């Protein structure tokens, strides 16, 4: 993948090869694939996430000295085209030797070099897919279900949202978002099961049965809709980038975010802490979007709080700034 290629451009190109990209949650329409994965933006399918670097593997980087370096499997003295002619595939990120130079470039705070291309892990294009919604009044049972699902390596897409986040993703106007926030349950776990290869129907059937059993043990249920919102609508939404305005900006016009990595068992505690911070300001916690994304096979997770505000309101801007600064200090 070269710089500037977006997810909207990558998806149809991969589909012709029987593949699909590992998607972050609703990336902006103009977001570069390479930029997203250099920033370690989490993907929504933790089963394909084996280490924090994934799905980025090899890169070619030009350093400030003019030196060109290729990392991982590509670290041999020949061009990319010459490697393809030899049957080489750029599938391993570590290298040369045992040093992971790709990881040095990820999350860099400043310019270390210019990346001219990168190789990424993809997933087989599903022949069948089915998405389920699991709702609850509090996130704790849903976190326990996410643990159980990732432990058994079931499903593909798996993420936890509160109603403020899901409404912002589904709605296109402030009025529609507000109406959805009233209708939707407080917390929703999104579970997608895909099937590629042979016997796709059977694969979906046995995974659905196992996930249903896990949910019932926690007093939960897998459903095809939540508050009249069909799972197919959410599945279509998750399959690509944000069509127009970034979903975090739709309701108020501007937004600020706090995000960090932790483990799933601590996620609910951080949510409670941020709820207490929000109670000290005018903005109620219900107006704050929460997104919990299991990563690295469920070994840890990405937790994100999204605070919307009107850029025309000095008071709202100050409140959002205060909540980000105070929240970052208390959650650190």
Question: What kind of feature is each model-predicted range?
Answer:
Residues 1-2, 258:
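Generic recognition of long tandem-repeat/solenoid scaffolds
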Residues 3, 7-145:
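FAD-binding subdomain of flavoenzyme oxidoreductases
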Residues 120, 130-327, 332:
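C-terminal substrate-recognition/cap domain of FAD-linked oxidoreductases
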């Amino acid at each position: 993948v070269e710089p500037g290629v977006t997810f909207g451009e990558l998806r149809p190109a991969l589909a012709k090869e029987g593949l699909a990209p590992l998607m972050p949650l609703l990336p902006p329409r103009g977001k570069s694939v390479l930029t997203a994965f250099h920033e370690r933006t989490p993907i929504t399918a933790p089963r394909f996430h084996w280490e924090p670097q994934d799905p980025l593997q090899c890169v070619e980087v030009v350093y400030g000295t003019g030196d060109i370096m290729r990392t991982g499997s590509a670290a041999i003295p020949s061009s990319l085209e010459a490697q393809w002619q030899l049957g080489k595939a750029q599938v391993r990120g570590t290298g040369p030797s045992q040093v992971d130079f790709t990881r040095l470039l990820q999350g860099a705070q400043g310019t270390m070099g210019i990346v001219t291309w990168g190789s990424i892990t993809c997933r087989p294009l599903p022949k069948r897919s089915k998405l389920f919604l699991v709702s609850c009044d509090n996130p704790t049972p849903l976190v326990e279900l996410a643990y159980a699902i990732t432990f058994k390596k079931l499903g593909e897409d798996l993420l936890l949202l509160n109603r403020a986040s899901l409404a912002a993703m589904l709605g296109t106007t402030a009025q529609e978002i507000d109406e959805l926030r009233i209708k939707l349950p407080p917390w929703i776990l999104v579970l997608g099961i895909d099937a590629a290869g042979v016997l796709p129907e059977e694969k979906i059937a046995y995974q659905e049965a196992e996930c249903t059993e896990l949910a019932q043990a926690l007093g939960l249920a897998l459903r095809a809709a939540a508050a009249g919102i069909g799972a197919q609508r959410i599945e279509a939404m998750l399959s690509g980038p944000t069509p127009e305005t970034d979903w975090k900006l739709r309701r108020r016009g501007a937004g600020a975010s706090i995000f960090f990595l932790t483990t799933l068992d601590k996620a609910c505690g951080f949510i409670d802490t941020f709820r207490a911070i929000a109670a000290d300001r005018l903005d109620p916690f219900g107006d704050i979007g929460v997104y919990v994304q299991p990563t690295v096979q469920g070994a840890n997770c990405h937790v994100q709080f999204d605070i919307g505000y009107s850029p025309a309101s000095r008071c709202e801007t100050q409140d959002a700034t205060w909540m980000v600064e105070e929240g970052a200090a208390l959650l650190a």
